[in-house]
C-alpha cells in the first residue's frame, strides 16, 4: 500500500504545492519513469487543472533520501560516480564522487515524487496554483513603484 508525497510545480505562477497521494491513486504512479506524462484529471480531488493539462514526472527521492536519477534504469538503488546534478553538485570543476541514487522508475520505496504541470498549447488562463495574498501585494507595490 504505497503512499507518496507529490510536489507539483506550476510554471506559470512559479509556485509548488505538496499533496499526499494514497491508494488507489498511488497505484497509477507505480511504474512511471522520469519524463513520463499522465493526464491531469487524476488529481481532480486535490487541484482543479485546466482541460487538457498533463503532469510530467521530473524526479523524486527514496525512503533513505537518495534522489531519483534519470540515467539509472529501473526501480533500483545504485552507487554511481557522479560528476554533476542530479544528486551531486561538485565544489570544483572536474570533481567526481560516488553517490547513492535511485533508478528512474517509481516503486513502493519512493516517498516523494516531483512533477510539473504541462499546460495545453496556447493556454492563457489563470495558473492552477495561484499566487498568495502576500505575493499579489508585493507585485502591486512593485508595479506602483513603492518599495516592498
UniProtKB/Swiss-Prot annotation:
Single GO BP term: translation
Signal peptide: none
Coiled coil region boundaries: none
UniProt GO MF annotations: structural constituent of ribosome
Any Gene Ontology CC annotation: ribonucleoprotein complex
Alphabetical keyword list: Ribonucleoprotein, Ribosomal protein
Pfam families tied to this protein: Ribosomal_S6e (PF01092)
HAMAP family attached to this UniProt entry: Ribosomal_eS6
Homology family: Belongs to the eukaryotic ribosomal protein eS6 family.
Name of protein: Small ribosomal subunit protein eS6
Species per Swiss-Prot/TrEMBL record: Pyrobaculum islandicum (strain DSM 4184 / JCM 9189 / GEO3)
Amino acid at each position: 500500500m504505497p503512499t507518496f508525497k507529490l510536489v507539483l510545480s506550476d510554471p506559470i505562477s512559479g509556485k509548488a504545492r505538496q499533496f499526499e497521494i494514497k491508494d488507489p491513486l498511488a497505484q497509477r504512479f507505480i511504474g512511471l519513469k522520469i519524463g513520463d506524462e499522465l493526464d491531469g484529471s487524476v488529481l481532480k480531488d486535490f487541484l482543479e487543472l485546466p482541460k487538457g493539462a498533463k503532469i510530467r514526472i521530473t524526479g523524486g527521492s527514496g525512503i533513505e533520501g537518495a534522489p531519483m536519477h534519470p540515467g539509472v534504469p529501473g526501480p533500483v538503488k545504485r552507487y554511481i560516480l557522479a560528476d554533476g546534478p542530479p544528486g551531486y553538485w561538485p565544489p570544483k570543476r572536474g570533481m567526481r564522487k560516488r553517490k547513492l541514487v535511485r533508478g528512474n522508475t517509481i516503486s513502493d520505496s519512493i516517498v516523494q515524487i516531483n512533477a510539473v504541470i504541462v499546460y495545453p498549447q496556447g493556454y492563457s488562463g489563470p495558473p492552477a496554483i495561484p499566487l498568495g495574498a502576500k505575493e499579489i501585494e508585493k507585485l502591486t507595490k512593485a508595479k506602483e513603484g513603492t518599495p516592498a
